[in-house]
Amino acid sequence: MKHIILLISFMTFTFNISFAQDDNQRITDEKSGKEILIGTVTRAGLEEIGGWFATEYQQYQPDTSDIALLKNFQSDFPFIFIVLGTWCGDSHEQVPRFFKILDQLQYPSEKVFMVALDRDKKAKDFCIGDYDIKLVPTFIITNQGEETGRIIETPTETLERDLLNILRGSAPAPR
């Protein structure tokens, strides 16, 4: 039953994407007074806001042996759903690192979907409640429409190792 609900949720989410007004919508964060992104976002949108993306992306060096092993599993994770907050320090750190891993895997960008939340864990025009998001960033890995694992907030080991463990079926339960 859980798998059916997840599949329906992803289908609904995909349907909403088709009719979404705009990616990379900006609002002012009430706490910091800075601009943040909300709703569906793209990598380009993340790269434009705040300057943190490029710095973390350039500094991160994924483990090459884990990257080599991940290349064997690429067909096993056809869809990656990332829920983040552009106001969140963990998102500033982990999301660029995740993209560095995906780039080294030459992973197609159309297989990655991102939603940015505000501090109340809400996204404009999207019901995020179906995904049980408590912390950001949350990386949801799916296989054939079913969730196979999550990396929540920060990895247990490294992003690439946690992703590898999810694909091997040996990942620890999410926190």
Predicted regions and their residues:
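Bacterial Sec-dependent N-terminal signal peptides
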Residues: 1-23
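N-terminal leader/targeting and pre-domain segments
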Residues: 22-75
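Conserved helix-turn-beta segment immediately C-terminal to the redox Cys motif
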Residues: 71-79, 97-115
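Thiol-based oxidoreductase modules, predominantly thioredoxin-like and allied folds used
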Residues: 82-86, 109-123
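Conserved redox-active cysteine motifs that mediate thiol-disulfide chemistry
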Residues: 86-94
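Structural alpha/beta surface segment adjacent to cysteine/selenocysteine redox centers
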Residues: 124-135
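Non-catalytic, surface beta->alpha helical segment in thiol-disulfide oxidoreductase systems
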Residues: 135, 141-175
